[in-house]
Amino acid sequence: MSEEKAVSTEERASRKVRVGYVVSDKMEKTIVVELEDRVKHKLYGKIIRRTTKVKAHDENGVAGVGDRVQLMETRPLSATKHWRLVEVLEKAK
């Protein structure tokens, strides 16, 4: 009797993708990226810019300060690193 194994094709949950600018590349295989979020003020309606700095994994060290990069959320790689570099969208001038 040969039984066929049920192949489970579980989809991964959708991961967050963000675009930001590299503000530091002094660590090995790690870059610090500033992400900008625009929110509307609850009462006055003015658009406010909020920025967050996150650490991202850059395996090959291709990103430099000032580069515009695309990040994707990933499993925790260290205590503070939860993002990885997908691609460099635009090199710094």
Curated annotation (Swiss-Prot):
GO terms for molecular function: rRNA binding; structural constituent of ribosome. One of its GO terms (biological process) is translation. CDD domains: Ribosomal_uS17 (cd00364). Keywords: Ribonucleoprotein, Ribosomal protein, RNA-binding, rRNA-binding. Pfam families: Ribosomal_S17. One of its GO terms (cellular component) is cytosolic small ribosomal subunit. Part of the 30S ribosomal subunit. One of the primary rRNA binding proteins, it binds specifically to the 5'-end of 16S ribosomal RNA. Belongs to the universal ribosomal protein uS17 family. This is Small ribosomal subunit protein uS17. It comes from Rhodococcus erythropolis (strain PR4 / NBRC 100887).
